[in-house]
Every structure is written in structure tokens, then in C-alpha cells.
Amino acid sequence: MIYIGLPQWSHPKWVRLGITSLEEYARHFNCVEGNTTLYALPKPEVVLRWREQTTDDFRFCFKFPATISHQAALRHCDDLVTEFLTRMSPLAPRIGQYWLQLPATFGPRELPALWHFLDSLPGEFNYGVEVRHPQFFAKGEEEQTLNRGLHQRGVNQVILDSRPVHAARPHSEAIRDAQRKKPKVPVHAVLTATNPLIRFIGSDDMTQNRELFQVWLQKLAQWHQTTTPYLFLHTPDIAQAPELVHTLWEDLRKTLPEIGAVPAIPQQSSLF
């Protein structure tokens, strides 16, 4: 099994694809990257509506709120964690994983706080961690310590692949904005648990995206044997994200013919 989705479930330009709600999005994709929870908790009635609009086969991968990962830096935040998990509890059977997106200021010295935080989390969920500090990508003791600690706890490494967007010509504001905001970190495809999460940050050049994605075809074919990967596809202008899925899917299908149920992705070429 492999889960493939986008960073969000609606966009004005997706109306032409028949995607205007979470319910309609879930007819095409089997998971979504939950970016909204980084910035604010949804209201209880909104969480219930999300449950009503999906089935038990769908998976949410929500980010921990920034109040936990950034402001508190994982310290003295038990009440915030409880509030977050309680708020999202109606969706508990559909949680693919909760994951931390740590800022670049969170370095090796902060690892004890990360271990304490992860060790205090409830055991019924899968978890992931995305790091951005340069030392965690230097192939030294700091990176080894991080990977070893995640592996020991069964926590997934969230892998950011921003090569496409940083290789793109900065010919649009969307590209320039993404190049400013998306970290430019090395891609180390390290497996630390059973649900590796890949965030592929494409550009608006679909030919280039396809070329740079080739490395993931081999890796996903390998990981798919023993794990359940999550693949989230981004574009600088998120309106083009379904087109990126369509661009890459043929190669995915050739590489992983046995992956089972796949998103019923509409044809994009005439729409963008």
C-alpha cells in the first residue's frame, strides 16, 4: 500500500476537476497533508465535518501546532499536546501520522527535548519528524544520533525533497516565493520506521519534475516491500499539484504495479 496526496484538499482552480470539498478530494486521493493545524486548531464542529466527509480508508497526516514545535520548542507543552490530540480525536482511526515540522533553529543540542517529547506521546498513533538544522544533514555524529533515536522509538523521518523548486528558473512570483520559503537541504532517504513520509516539492516544469522524481521510484519500490509510504506532492502554485500527480503517476504505476488501490486522478493536460 502507498498513500498519495496533496498538501491541501481544496483550491479555487480545482473546481474544474470537480474538487470543491474534502469529500470530493477524497474520491481522488487517499490521504492529505494537514498543514492547517500548524497555524491553528480547527473548531470541534469542523473536525466532525471532516470525519463525515471521509471514510475509514482515508488518512490525515496532521502537523503538530507551531505553538508546540516552534514557540514551546517541545518543552512544557503537555497541555497543548493534550488539547491538540483531544480536538482531533474524532479522526483517530483515520490518522496516518502526526508529525513535527521543526525549525532550523532546532539543532542537536535540543535532541533531549525531542526524545522526551516523543517518549511522552500516546502509543496508539504513528509519528514523524522533519528537521531543518544543517548539522542533521552533514552525515556526522549529529545525523546518526537523530536517526538512531527515531529508529529506536519507531518514529518516521519526514523527508523533504525541494530539489525541483530550487532548480527551477525564478520566472514567476510563485517560484520565487517557494524558493524563499522552502528549505534547501540535502535529501537523505533514511528509513527509521514503517511509514516514511516524502514531501516532494515540485516546480512548474513538469518535465524536470519527472526527471528528478526518478530516484524516488527506486526507493519507493524498495520501501513498499516492508513499509507503507506516504507521498505528498507540492507545486509552487498549488493549483498545479493535481497536474504533478498526473505527470508522475504513469511512472509510479509502471514501477509499482502491485500497489493496489490508487487515486482516480482526472486528466490535467487540458485544464492547466
From Swiss-Prot:
Under Gene3D superfamilies, the record lists:
Protein of unknown function UPF0759
InterPro entries associated with the record: DUF72, UPF0759_sf
Fetch the Pfam families from UniProt: DUF72 (PF01904)
NCBIfam families xref list: PRK10302.1 (NF007637)
Which Cys pairs does UniProt list as disulfide-bonded? Answer: none
Question: Of which family is this protein a member?
Answer: Belongs to the UPF0759 family.
Taxonomic lineage from the root: Bacteria, Pseudomonadati, Pseudomonadota, Gammaproteobacteria, Enterobacterales
Q: What is this protein called?
A: UPF0759 protein YecE
